[in-house]
Structures are given as C-alpha cells and as structure tokens.
Amino acid sequence: MGNGKAFYLGGHYDEVKNCTFHDNGELGFQISRLIATEVSVSEWPSNNLVLNCESYNNNDPSKNNADGFACKLTAGYNNVFSGCSSHHNLDDGWDCYTKLATGAIGPVQVENCVAYRNGYQLNDDASETDWGNGAGCNGFKMGGENIHVAHYLKDCISWGNKRSGVDSNYNPGFKMRNVISYNNEGP
C-alpha cells in the first residue's frame, strides 16, 4: 500500500484513458483544485474526461477517505467519468461530495460505469476481507451537506457494496437514468 492519492488532477481539458489505480494509501483518483487560492468554482478543474479506467483496493489509515474515484470539494464544471470501474475500495466507489465551507461544485456526469464490492478488500488469492467500518462503502455517493448540485448518473450498475449502491447524500439536485442497483447491504 502506497501513501496518498495515486492521481490528483487539478487541470482543465485533460483526458485520462485506460489507466488503473490500485493499492494506494488513500484514494485512487481525484479531481479537485491544487491551489488553495482558487476559491471560485469557475477556477476549479473543469472539462476533464476520465475514460475506461479502473480503481480498486485503495485504503487509508483513517478509514474514511479511500474512494476509488472522487470529483469533490473543489471541482469545476463538465467533468465526466465514462466506462470506468471502481471496486474493493475502503470508502466509496465514486465520491462527488460537496461541503458548505467551499460551496457547490460543478455537476459531475458518471456514465456507463460500474461500482461493486466497495467496503471489501480484494486479496491476492482473489478472496475478500471486510475492510471494517469505513466511512462510506457506497457504490456511488452523489453529494453532501444538502447542497443542490445537478450530478447525473446514467447507464450505471452498482452491486454488492457494503452500504448503498447509490446514495444522494442529501443532494436535492442529483439525477439518474437507467441505473441498476442490487444486492447492496444497505445504509
């Protein structure tokens, strides 16, 4: 297990394709600002595409911030995840969290993606171990702190996660279409 994030994207108009992020000491891949003086959503990373990537087996010492993919806290507009897979992470498969201190982020689109077995570790022999009580363990977490953000989840599947397959996390603006969520263990 490494230390920190595998990949932290703070730019604009980037494409990340056919990459794998695994066994990191925090989350696998995150889109968020890199410079603290960027305080407006218009300055935050925007217009990025993450295509056909996989993130798995990410774990952090605090047991609450090891998402597979994250586009949260300080991310701008038009960030898209397409054809990606997130599984066996300590925390959420996808985390699109927003908090009051920084304000609403730009809407995130997640399409044709799968999230499964988050909350469980994938061992070298292909068996699984329960990570314990991680913070999320959801397939797709699409908001936070009752802030309206028009995140859009479409044509995705979520199954076998330790908690919810899809969690709006108090986001009143979240939308989804053609999403299948089954055999998740619940809240």
Positions of predicted regions on the chain:
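Beta-rich extracellular carbohydrate-active architectures
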Residues: M1, V16, T20-H22, E26, ...
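Short "repeat-start/strand-capping" segments in structured domains, especially the N-termini
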Residues: H12-E15, L34-A36, S46, Y77-N78, ...
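Extracellular beta-strand/beta-solenoid scaffold signature
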Residues: G2-Y8, D23-P45, N58-T74, H88-T102, ...
